Amino acid sequence: MTKKAVVVLWGISQVEGVVNLLQE
């Protein structure tokens, strides 16, 4: 995996975590 791909996937996982917190 390229470094950019890792950063993108990490960012997506962070956003999903925030969305889950807001939905609860």
Curated annotation (Swiss-Prot):
Signal peptide: none annotated. GO terms for molecular function: metal ion binding; superoxide dismutase activity. Its EC number is 1.15.1.1. Keywords: Antioxidant, Chloroplast, Copper, Metal-binding, Oxidoreductase, Plastid, Zinc. It is found in: Plastid, Chloroplast. Belongs to the Cu-Zn superoxide dismutase family. Destroys radicals which are normally produced within the cells and which are toxic to biological systems. This is Superoxide dismutase [Cu-Zn], chloroplastic.
